[in-house]
């Protein structure tokens, strides 16, 4: 195959965002996987002679099945969780490498790949320090899901949602990079790109601060629970620690500022693709909307468990917005801890 048979012909920037131009004409190349497995194509030929979006689809499906097999073997559901900070960036780098190989990589494409690498490095480190990569570590929410879901449904949920859908979703989150690659330099990096870049950087710093505040609080709480002392580097009083959950710093105003930042980070990546293709709305927005849906569902489960564990959490829900701060300025204050002490 040639470049003409693996890449769409782009007559205008908007063509890069059209499903019927950029994706559907190449879905027949899914059959190239059979050629690879039968030895009729080596991997290099398969990689460079198959549409890059189709390559990503095939690799994500294969990886989802591999992770499902590992999960069944280890009886641990967090296999995808371990790769969550890595896969979107890996898929974006796939598009970057393809663009470099065919000399169509734009400044915008390189910036997107760099920003996603920053995102990946930070999230991987945060997941590592929380013990996510420890042998046998598993997200407590999956344990709860297994408990509440009918036994006959869970195997289907375990395969199709946790592994196939989630890996495919992580791939689709990187799809704006595909659009940016196709658009090339049809639209120069300009003011709107800078706005998307600034949105990313602001939310990146916000999420980093929120995660650090969360880490500091639970480190102090766990330390106090062990030996009834709080290291001097932590500035928490006993009322705050006795509450059991973090309601200080950014968490005074938002119950999940890190989740808010994460959703807006991926909105910024969507915007890069929309700007590159001059298409404010295109098919890649469904990946971002899917991420919003995932956060809605996982947050509901997390908060249900928090309400069962911490008596004050329902009060916290009433006073503080889930993601965005309340318009009326309502937030958590020290008097809320004092009031709870009196009630107890």
Swiss-Prot record:
Topological relation to the membrane, as annotated: Multi-pass membrane protein
Annotated localization: Endoplasmic reticulum membrane
InterPro entries linked: UstE-like
Pfam families: DUF1295 (PF06966)
Domain of life: Eukaryota
GO MF terms held by the record: steroid dehydrogenase activity
Protein name: Uncharacterized protein C594.04c
């Amino acid at each position: 195959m040639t470049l003409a048979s693996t890449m769409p012909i782009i007559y205008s920037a908007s063509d890069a965002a059209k499903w019927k131009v950029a994706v559907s004409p190449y879905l027949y190349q899914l059959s190239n996987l059979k050629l690879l497995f039968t030895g009729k194509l080596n991997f290099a030929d398969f990689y460079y002679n198959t549409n890059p979006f189709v390559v990503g689809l095939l690799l994500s499906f294969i990886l989802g099945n591999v992770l499902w097999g590992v999960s069944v073997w280890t009886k641990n559901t967090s296999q995808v969780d371990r790769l969550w900070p890595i896969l979107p960036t890996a898929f974006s780098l796939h598009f970057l490498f393809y663009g470099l190989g065919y000399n169509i990589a734009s400044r915008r494409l390189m910036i997107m790949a760099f920003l996603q690498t920053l995102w990946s490095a930070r999230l991987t480190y945060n997941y590592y320090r929380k013990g996510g990569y420890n042998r046998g570590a598993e997200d407590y929410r999956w344990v709860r899901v297994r408990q509440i879901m009918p036994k006959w449904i869970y195997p289907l949920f375990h395969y199709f949602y946790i592994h196939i859908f989630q890996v495919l979703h992580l791939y689709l989150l990187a799809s704006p990079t595909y659009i940016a690659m196709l658009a090339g330099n049809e639209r120069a990096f300009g003011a709107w790109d800078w706005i998307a870049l600034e949105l990313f950087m602001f939310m990146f710093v916000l999420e980093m601060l929120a995660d650090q505040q969360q880490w500091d609080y639970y480190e102090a709480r766990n330390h106090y629970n062990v030996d009834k002392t709080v290291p001097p580097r932590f500035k928490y009083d006993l009322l705050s620690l006795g509450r059991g959950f973090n309601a200080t710093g950014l968490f005074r105003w938002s119950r999940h500022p890190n989740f808010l930042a994460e959703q807006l980070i991926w909105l910024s990546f969507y915007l890069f693709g929309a700007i590159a293709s001059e298409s404010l709305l295109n098919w890649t927005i469904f990946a971002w909307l899917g991420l919003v849906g995932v956060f809605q569902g996982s947050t509901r489960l997390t908060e249900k468990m928090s309400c069962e564990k911490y008596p004050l959490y329902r009060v916290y829900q009433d006073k503080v917005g889930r993601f965005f701060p309340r318009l009326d300025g309502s937030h958590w204050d020290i008097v809320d801890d004092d009031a709870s002490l009196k009630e107890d």
